[in-house]
Amino acid sequence: MARLNELYKNEIVPQLTKDFGYSNIMQVPKIEKIVVNMGLGEAIQNVKILDSAVEELAMITGQKSVITKAKKSIASFKLRQGMPIGCMVTLRREKMFEFLDRLINVALPRVRDFKGVSGKGFDGRGNYSLGIKEQLIFPEIEYDKIDKIKGLNITIVTSARSDEEGKALLKQLGMPFRN
């Protein structure tokens, strides 16, 4: 069992039940899934960029990624409907907890001048999104083998009903918030 999953079941659930006064442990918010997305506008001109992005995302998450396609055509961007413009991975269960553990304890501390993640990334329903400017912070990516620095978006979807509950859950899991 993943370390964070064990921590969640043994320590976080009782703590959050006490803090928010839940009458049932099923009311305690939990992480449902983590979506890692890499949007690549440059893939319109150069399709090879997309191949390396798919490979890097698979190394970071440990799961094969899905290529995302444009929903509609936009002439000013020279974009046609159905063109590949990015890739994404949805993580659940064990892989989700292992990825979150690596993100919090290994990857985020490797960011230059890291003071913590912003507390403003909540959407009003307890889900948290953060952007990472370069994929190099993950130890799985080798500096010599990358052709271009690419950023990625990470969305942590929780069952929390409010931002306050979601932030309390992520803080207990070890997410380093700035404020």
Swiss-Prot record:
- PROSITE patterns, per the entry: RIBOSOMAL_L5
Q: Which InterPro entries match?
A: Ribosomal_uL5, Ribosomal_uL5_bac-type, Ribosomal_uL5_C, Ribosomal_uL5_CS, Ribosomal_uL5_dom_sf, Ribosomal_uL5_N
**In Gene Ontology terms, what is one molecular function of this protein?**
structural constituent of ribosome
Instruction: Provide a GO biological process annotation.
Output: translation
Give the record's keywords alphabetically. Answer: Ribonucleoprotein, Ribosomal protein, RNA-binding, rRNA-binding, tRNA-binding
Question: A Gene Ontology CC term for this entry?
Answer: ribosome
- Establish whether keyword Isomerase is in the entry: no
Q: Which PANTHER family match?
A: 60S RIBOSOMAL PROTEIN L11-RELATED
Instruction: Explain the purpose of this protein.
Output: This is one of the proteins that bind and probably mediate the attachment of the 5S RNA into the large ribosomal subunit, where it forms part of the central protuberance. In the 70S ribosome it contacts protein S13 of the 30S subunit (bridge B1b), connecting the 2 subunits; this bridge is implicated in subunit movement. Contacts the P site tRNA; the 5S rRNA and some of its associated proteins might help stabilize positioning of ribosome-bound tRNAs.
What is said about its interaction partners and assembly?
A: Part of the 50S ribosomal subunit; part of the 5S rRNA/L5/L18/L25 subcomplex. Contacts the 5S rRNA and the P site tRNA. Forms a bridge to the 30S subunit in the 70S ribosome.
The entry's family comment says:
Belongs to the universal ribosomal protein uL5 family.
| Protein name (record) | Large ribosomal subunit protein uL5
Protein source organism: Geobacter metallireducens (strain ATCC 53774 / DSM 7210 / GS-15)
Q: Which gene encodes it?
A: rplE
